[in-house]
Amino acid sequence: MTWQNDYSRDYEVKNHMECQNRSDKYIWSPHDAYFYKGLSELIVDIDRLIYLSLEKIRKDFVFINLNTDSLTEFINRDNEWLSAVKGKQVVLIAARKSEALANYWYYNSNIRGVVYAGLSRDIRKELAYVINGRFLRKDIKKDKITDREMEIIRMTAQGMLPKSIARIENCSVKTVYTHRRNAEAKLYSKIYKLVP
């Protein structure tokens, strides 16, 4: 089975964030050749572990690569990309620094599951587990970002300073820094490094 063929339709989302549905694959970001190749090989490799046909997976699923290169777009436009994939079975592939964000989107939207791409885990089994629909809230392995932390992350990603954020959120600057520190602990990184 090959996952490469012609394009059948494209979805455009503001500022170059696009989701491309090819007749035989559905990934986001479509320009991430390494993600595409690796995911294709993994899915073919786990064919015997999954209950659904490969054709159904190609037709009904969206696999989203949440890595540090794409986080700014996903954070700034989460309502847009969530709307663009409505009706699809969304699987988030989360790098270590994006696990808490993946958990936030799992809890706050219609995400099928999260595959934690940490080095110590068997990604094949985790991917099959999610595709087979067995991923549940009890499977969340890390903290999730709170709604307030997410608002502060979004505003920081847009270049807003803590004082401006405090004014908008109707809280003190100290509170903004506290939420930011809590989010950074969950993300294993400073926010400004994740969303330059």
From Swiss-Prot:
UniProt entry keywords in alphabetical sequence: Activator, Cytoplasm, DNA-binding, Transcription, Transcription regulation
The name on file for this protein is: HTH-type transcriptional regulator EcpR
| Major location (coarse) | cytoplasm
Q: Where is the signal peptide?
A: none
Annotated GO MF terms: DNA binding
Query: Main role?
Result: Part of the ecpRABCDE operon, which encodes the E.coli common pilus (ECP). ECP is found in both commensal and pathogenic strains and plays a dual role in early-stage biofilm development and host cell recognition. Positively regulates the expression of the ecp operon.
Question: Which InterPro entries does UniProt cross-reference here?
Answer: Sig_transdc_resp-reg_C-effctor (IPR016032), Tscrpt_reg_LuxR_C (IPR000792), WH-like_DNA-bd_sf (IPR036388)
**The HTH luxR-type domain, residue ranges:** 138-196
* Matching CDD domains: LuxR_C_like
* Entry GO terms, CC: cytoplasm
The entry assigns this protein to a family as follows:
Belongs to the EcpR/MatA family.
GO biological process, alphabetically ordered: regulation of DNA-templated transcription
DNA-binding: present as a keyword of the record? yes
Expression induction: Negatively regulated by H-NS. Positively autoregulated. Also positively regulated by IHF.
Q: Which SUPFAM superfamilies match?
A: C-terminal effector domain of the bipartite response regulators
